[in-house]
């Protein structure tokens, strides 16, 4: 089966699949009317931002709605800057905008691919900062009522790579805008890896931004050169007891203590030390510089990528007894599906 609209330019893995129809929306009103019409018609619909967190395993027998809405408005009070951002804005460009406006707080999240509207769905995060730390509200279209509604940060039920939009509002909501709240009393977040060498008293937000961009550019391949979706696996969270057992057998294991006493393990370390860094299965491979990233080595299909992911999960579980979970959405013929394609 082949549909008329190619999806290859609209997914960063560069997988060659197609869809039945495609609509580009440039305004919030257009986004509302388009999505409501499709939802009420009960036809398969996929709302797509940057396509940086998705694996197409088949042609999509429905309509892809590309969100291209733009707009950033800023306000402030005595303690905070506030940004209201339309869903179609590019996330990294928003980070640059905020720094250029002397509104620090987003620098740790530099170079994360995708759009602002996609950011709350999986509560994007990097280098010790998550969206939930700076999110004020999320506005969404309720597909059942047709109303625009707004959730506070608490109501979004954010967790590690999780939110209400992956839970009870999955397939029922389309994010239209996101509100951010940045403290004027800025404090650098330097707990992770390459940022630990900075002096908290003297470092600037621009220096953190530059370092994050430098490190991400070194480790993460440019999707235009080597198709990928960034980090493919979530960093698994284990109990303190499990971590101690693992550390006894693998003294160099990388883990980060969590506020609740659990430990977040570095999935990239687990994959590398399971002997899979640079491993390839057909046209899909584990990136040679960053084992957390799966790449399209040429003409990989979505099935190739999923098969490789399942192999990585099985091998890491075999070596460490830890089960990895995939981050990207796996999209089949009529909607979201599982890795086991």
UniProtKB/Swiss-Prot annotation:
One Pfam annotation reads FAD_binding_4
Report the subcellular localization. Cytoplasm
What are the required cofactors? Answer: FAD
Q: Active site: which residues?
A: 161, 231, 327
What the record says about family reads:
Belongs to the MurB family.
* HAMAP family found in the cross-reference section: MurB
Name of the protein in its database record: UDP-N-acetylenolpyruvoylglucosamine reductase
């Amino acid at each position: 089966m082949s549909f008329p609209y190619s999806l290859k330019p609209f997914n960063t893995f560069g997988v060659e699949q197609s869809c039945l129809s495609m609509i580009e929306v440039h305004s919030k009103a257009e986004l509302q009317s388009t999505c409501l019409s499709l939802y009420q018609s009960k036809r398969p619909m996929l709302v797509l931002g940057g396509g940086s967190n998705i694996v197409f395993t088949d042609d999509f027998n429905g309509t892809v709605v590309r969100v291209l809405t733009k707009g950033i408005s800023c306000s402030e009070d005595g303690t905070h800057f506030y940004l209201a951002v339309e869903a179609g804005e590019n996330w990294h460009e928003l980070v640059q905008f905020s720094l250029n406006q002397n509104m620090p707080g987003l620098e740790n999240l530099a170079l994360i691919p995708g759009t602002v509207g996609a950011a709350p769905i999986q509560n994007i995060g990097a280098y010790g900062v998550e969206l939930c730390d700076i999110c004020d509200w999320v506005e969404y279209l309720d597909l059942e009522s047709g109303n625009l509604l707004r959730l506070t940060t608490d109501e979004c039920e954010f967790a590690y790579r999780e939110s209400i939009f992956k839970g009870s509002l999955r397939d029922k909501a389309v994010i239209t805008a996101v509100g951010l709240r940045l403290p004027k009393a800025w404090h650098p977040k330097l707990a992770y890896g390459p940022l630990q060498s900075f002096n908290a008293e003297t470092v600037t937000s621009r220096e953190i931004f530059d370092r994050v961009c430098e490190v991400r550019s070194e480790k993460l391949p440019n999707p235009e050169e080597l198709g990928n979706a960034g980090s493919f696996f979530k960093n698994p969270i284990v109990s303190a007891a499990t971590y101690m057992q693992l550390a006894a057998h693998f003294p160099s294991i990388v883990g980060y203590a969590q506020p609740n006493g659990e430990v977040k393990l570095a999935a990239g370390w687990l994959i590398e030390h399971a002997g899979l860094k640079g491993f390839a299965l057909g046209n899909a491979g584990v990136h040679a510089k960053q084992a957390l990233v799966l790449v399209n080595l040429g003409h990989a299909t979505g099935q190739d990528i999923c098969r490789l992911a399942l192999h990585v999960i099985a091998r890491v579980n075999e070596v460490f007894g830890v089960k990895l979970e995939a981050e990207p959405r796996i999209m089949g013929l009529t909607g979201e599906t599982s890795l086991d394609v």
